């Protein structure tokens, strides 16, 4: 009984213990979901996640400060310790109104979080799980805020007040966003009413608040806006010119006026080369440690992003100078000041006169008022305006148009990224969250070269891009948003560059000074401090990697395919002590032979590849697997087999008999097929040298109806399988089949009218399938559906002819036809500027296409079309293919005729790639500036062209007569570099081409507006040094591409600044104001 009782008690105890453990686990789970558990914020994949909302796409931002880390989701702020433990210290529950982003998110203290979303702003405090939030009233009756677009908040610590800058859509005028600056008492409950506010003038639009901070008794905001250029209004009493400016705004922290009259704004920039006022600020960060402001802005004149750095000491000095200068002029002297500044009415003279570029927002009128002393009485300090004896003549709210020049840190060519949303400094490097043109969001790490050019180092995708997508922790980790939550990354050589390939993509130049250790069994990324412990340290080169290695079946040598082989000089192979002499070397493989008396046995399992990298010899071991052996015959060493007594005669006889048997079988099959299917016609296209045709040329039509009898049902089946959004009802089309207008790779083209609804009708083009190439025909349509760009032909849809069941591709109608025919036509008056516009349009379209990882493979003037406004659109995608994302190459699977006169010589060995289109683009520009001549017209075929191009890099198409030397050398010859890696990308070309135009405008603008004659074929065969060769008379080849900033003049224009009589209406390059920045190129103090 005792024993039984004991056992019973043990069971009860075990049951109770299990229940207790279950309750403990349940309590832990409940605490975890409530955000109270002191657990880590790190999952098994090294991803920081939001515990309070399991769907991690709800993570909208992350910030750090006061030794805390705050993760913001749609409905909660989760607060953690900013250390390795990441323990939860509290959370704030927000109201449940829908929000998609935070426009401001800032820690004011260890217990205060300020936020703004699209509709409201508030201040929250927390203590563990207890929290409260206030709502900041943004307006009374006026203005009526429809949506907040940007915001920045600053807490004035010693006063317990908050200043808030917001830009917003006004319900009454939503197309012109406005700005307000408001001041509040810091309050974390209820509704907080502003104690003062300032609304910007109505002529200032598209405002955006970038950042804000407090410094030495003043509050600063960095903002950007579009506004009327007030100096011109002042001179001429009217102006329609608007400028886009970036400005720093200062308020006195102790300003007690109801409308914040201490406000002063100064314009800032650092565009020494292009000194026009036309810069849109995108993101800014104040570096407290170094007392600097870093601003990323987009310059509309240079078409580049710029990173500018400003010393706060210089900014503050400018503010003091502006205020003191305005206080020097009394009210009685204002008329004389106006006369002195306004006459003569010449801007260049006015800008050098003291105080003539600072205006007061005395009221909300668009007429600018020169600043004079505030309040009409004695001169006041900027922070004492509330003591003014009179409420009249309150000349505050100053704005100075003398642009303060900062230090140019970096030029970032467009479109390296679209818009910079946020910026983090990391020593000599930077992290930025950026958005692209095609809904692509990335985090970048980059630094500046000595010449202020960007050096990209590292890049990764993020799920949501915004002001708070990235942050840096105390442990020198980068946190960024992903679809999983928050990804953590060590900011170190090993964290950023885990393998040599990532180093090669930009890590070599990282200021972290990373390199690759290629030691046996210890290959890794190392820092400069670890170099001494590495025997095989590599910098700027990666060790080769063996993809496979095959041994000859007579054991006399190897063939090896090696990645990264070009880095190795004087390569050698050694197999188990046996030297294998390298006999054949190409771009990615080597072959080697052993001595006749040496044989590599089957027991050998390792091969060493050695050679020079830089000035040091390296040796890399590779395992030789049994499965790789005996797969190749060494023809060179057949004599070795003779010495060993083998007789190859019978092998040769068998080979001959086998080949003859195969030929006989193929002949029988061909004979059978030709008699079995007599109606199937094989269409052979003419050689490429004879087929210089455009997409709208009429082609061969015979045999079509017979082909339909075989494939009609297949067409219907394939059409039904197409995506619904691509299908067009044939009943909505009226096709003019009596007048075909041309032929593409897979179809015949007709004009048509498309009526998707009763009230809408538009001209379109219908391309009908020819000769049964159904898969390639629909592939062209699928490819076109991937594109949406103003310089690429738009796909309307795909239809099926009701009567013939022929598939149809429907595209937009291009009124001016193909580019080749247009430039060939001598009746068309074409100016040199038009040719530049055509080239620029094509470059933009190709830049977009390459960003989508497609290559065109048939880029030529005949495949570019012109709309009624002479905008070029790239067409004919019959050869367009998706490239491999890693190699950026496309492997040709089927032989067919190709436009080889537009192709680079390397395609015969390496296949098609991104750089193939770059070469073709150079030929397209040559076509443009010869007005449609045929490339290599004196050579009959590719057999002659290919060896001529390979023989020397000087063997290239000659510079067309009348073509500017700078265009030929900087663009055409650059596109025709023998090494594909040295060719510019289209992302470079969209900047280079406008710069060539600016260069030309510097010495002969009239030439751009002159008619450009068609080049006679006789001149194309002449040497450039031949006396009969026509020349561009005003060529100045020794003039630098961009003038020095000290010699810059008001004559600098952009490509888009076309005279009214120009036939082109392209607005691809934005207009810029003719007004220059008013200070010198270096950073100025006043």
From Swiss-Prot:
Task: Output one GO BP term.
Answer: cell surface receptor protein tyrosine kinase signaling pathway
Gene3D superfamilies the UniProt entry points to: Transferase(Phosphotransferase) domain 1 (1.10.510.10), YVTN repeat-like/Quinoprotein amine dehydrogenase (2.130.10.10)
Molecular function as annotated in GO:
ATP binding; mitogen-activated protein kinase kinase kinase binding; protein tyrosine kinase activity; transmembrane receptor protein tyrosine kinase activity
SMART domains documented for this protein: TyrKc (SM00219)
Q: Where is this site: Required for shc-1 interaction?
A: 767
Q: Where is the active site?
A: 858
Protein kinase domain boundaries: 735-996
What do mutants without this gene show? Viable. Reduced axon regeneration 24 hours following injury of D-type motor neurons.
Record protein name field? Tyrosine-protein kinase receptor svh-2
């Amino acid at each position: 009984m005792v024993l039984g009782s004991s056992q019973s008690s043990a069971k009860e105890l075990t049951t109770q213990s299990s229940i207790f453990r279950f309750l403990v686990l349940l309590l832990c789970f409940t605490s975890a979901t409530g955000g109270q558990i002191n657990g880590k914020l790190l999952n098994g994949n090294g991803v920081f996640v939001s515990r309070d909302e399991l769907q991690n796409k709800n993570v909208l931002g992350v910030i750090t400060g006061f030794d805390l880390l705050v993760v913001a989701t749609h409905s909660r702020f989760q607060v953690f310790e900013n250390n390795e433990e990441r323990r939860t210290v509290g959370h704030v529950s927000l109201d449940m109104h829908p929000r998609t982003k935070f426009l401001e998110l800032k820690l004011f203290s260890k217990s205060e979080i300020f936020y703004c979303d699209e509709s409201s702003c508030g201040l929250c405090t927390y203590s563990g799980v207890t929290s409260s939030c206030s709502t900041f009233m943004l307006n009374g009756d006026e203005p009526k805020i429809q949506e907040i677009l940007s915001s920045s908040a600053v807490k004035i610590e010693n006063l317990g007040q908050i200043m808030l800058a917001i830009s917003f859509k006004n319900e009454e005028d939503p197309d012109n966003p406005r700005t307000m600056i408001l001041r509040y008492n810091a309050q974390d409950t209820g509704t907080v009413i502003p104690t003062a506010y300032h609304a910007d003038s109505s002529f200032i639009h598209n405002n955006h608040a970038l950042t804000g901070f407090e410094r030495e008794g003043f509050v600063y905001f960095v903002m950007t806006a579009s506004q009327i250029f007030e100096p011109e209004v002042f001179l001429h009493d009217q102006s329609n010119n608007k400028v886009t400016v970036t400005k720093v705004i200062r308020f006195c922290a102790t300003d007690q006026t109801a409308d914040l009259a201490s406000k002063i704004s100064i314009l800032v920039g650092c565009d020494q080369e292009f000194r026009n006022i036309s810069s849109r600020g995108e993101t800014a960060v104040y570096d407290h440690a170094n007392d600097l402001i870093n601003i990323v802005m987009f310059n509309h004149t240079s078409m580049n992003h710029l990173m500018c750095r400003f010393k706060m000491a210089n900014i503050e000095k400018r503010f003091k100078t502006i205020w003191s200068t305005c206080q020097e002029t009394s009210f009685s002297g204002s008329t004389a000041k106006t006369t002195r500044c306004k006459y003569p009415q010449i801007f260049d003279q006015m800008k050098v006169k003291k105080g003539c570029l600072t205006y007061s927002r005395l009221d909300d009128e668009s007429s600018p008022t020169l600043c004079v002393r505030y309040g009409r009485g004695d001169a006041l300090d900027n922070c004492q305006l509330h003591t003014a004896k009179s409420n009249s003549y309150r000349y505050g709210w100053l704005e100075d148009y003398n642009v303060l020049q900062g230090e140019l840190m970096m030029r970032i060519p467009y479109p390296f990224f679209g818009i910079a949303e946020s910026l983090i400094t990391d020593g000599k490097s930077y992290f930025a969250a950026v958005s692209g043109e095609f809904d692509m969001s990335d985090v970048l790490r980059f630094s500046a070269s000595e010449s202020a050019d960007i050096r990209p180092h590292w890049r990764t995708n993020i799920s949501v891009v915004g002001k708070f997508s990235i942050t840096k922790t105390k442990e020198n980790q980068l946190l960024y948003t992903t679809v999983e939550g928050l990804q953590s990354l060590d900011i170190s050589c090993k964290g950023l560059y885990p393998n040599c390939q990532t180093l090669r993509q930009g890590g070599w130049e990282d200021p972290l000074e990373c390199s690759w250790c290629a030691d046996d069994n210890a290959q890794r990324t190392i820092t400069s401090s670890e170099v001494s412990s590495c025997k095989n340290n590599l910098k700027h080169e990666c060790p080769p990697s063996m993809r496979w290695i095959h041994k000859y079946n007579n054991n006399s040598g190897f063939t090896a395919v090696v990645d990264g082989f070009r880095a190795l000089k004087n390569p050698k192979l050694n197999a188990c002590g046996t030297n294998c002499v390298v006999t054949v070397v190409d771009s990615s493989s080597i072959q080697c032979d052993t001595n006749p008396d040496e044989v590599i046995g089957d027991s050998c399992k390792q091969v060493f590849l050695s050679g020079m990298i830089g000035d040091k010899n390296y040796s890399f071991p590779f395992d030789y697997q049994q499965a790789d052996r005996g797969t190749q015959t060494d023809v060179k060493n057949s004599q070795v087999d003779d010495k060993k007594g083998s007789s190859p005669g019978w092998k040769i006889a068998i080979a001959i008999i086998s080949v003859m048997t195969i030929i006989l079988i193929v002949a029988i099959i061909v004979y059978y097929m030709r008699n079995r299917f007599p109606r199937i016609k094989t269409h052979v296209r003419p050689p490429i040298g004879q087929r210089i045709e455009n997409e709208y040329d009429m082609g061969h039509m015979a045999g079509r109806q017979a082909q339909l009898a075989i494939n009609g049902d297949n067409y219907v089946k394939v059409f039904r399988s197409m995506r619904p959004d691509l299908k067009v009802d044939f009943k909505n089309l009226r096709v003019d089949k009596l007048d075909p207008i041309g032929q593409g790779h897979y179809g015949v083209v007709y004009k048509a009218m498309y009526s998707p609804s009763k009230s809408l009708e538009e001209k379109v083009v219908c391309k009908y399938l020819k000769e049964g190439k159904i898969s390639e025909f629909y592939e062209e349509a699928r490819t076109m559906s991937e594109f949406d760009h103003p310089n690429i032909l738009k796909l309307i849809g795909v239809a099926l002819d009701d009567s013939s069941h022929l598939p149809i591709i429907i595209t937009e109608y291009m009124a001016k036809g193909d580019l080749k025919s247009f430039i060939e036509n001598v009746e068309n008056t074409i100016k040199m500027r038009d040719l530049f516009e055509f080239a620029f349009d094509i470059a933009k379209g190709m830049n977009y296409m390459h960003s989508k990882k497609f290559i065109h493979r048939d880029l030529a003037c005949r495949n570019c079309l012109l709309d009624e406004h002479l905008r070029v659109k790239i067409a004919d995608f019959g050869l367009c293919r998706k490239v491999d994302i890693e190699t950026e190459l496309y492997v040709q699977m089927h032989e067919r005729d190709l436009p080889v006169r537009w192709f680079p010589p390397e395609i015969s060995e390496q296949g098609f790639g991104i750089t193939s289109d770059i070469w073709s683009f150079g030929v397209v520009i040559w076509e443009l500036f010869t007005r449609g001549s045929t490339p290599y017209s004196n050579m009959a075929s590719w057999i002659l062209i290919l060896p001529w191009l390979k023989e020397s890099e000087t063997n290239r198409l000659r510079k067309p007569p009348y073509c500017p030397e700078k265009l030929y050398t900087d663009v055409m010859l650059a596109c025709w570099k023998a090494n594909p890696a040295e060719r510019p990308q289209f992302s470079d070309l969209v900047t280079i081409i406008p710069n060539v135009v600016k260069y030309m405008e510097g010495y002969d603008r009239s030439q751009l507006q002159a008619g450009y004659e068609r080049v006679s074929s006789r001149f194309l065969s002449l040497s450039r040094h031949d006396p009969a060769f026509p020349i561009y008379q005003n060529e100045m080849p020794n003039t630098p591409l961009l003038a020095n900033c000290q010699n810059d003049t008001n004559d600098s224009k952009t490509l888009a600044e076309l005279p009214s009589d120009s036939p082109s209406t392209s607005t691809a390059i934005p207009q810029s104001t003719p007004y220059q920045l008013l200070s010198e190129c270096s950073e100025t103090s006043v």
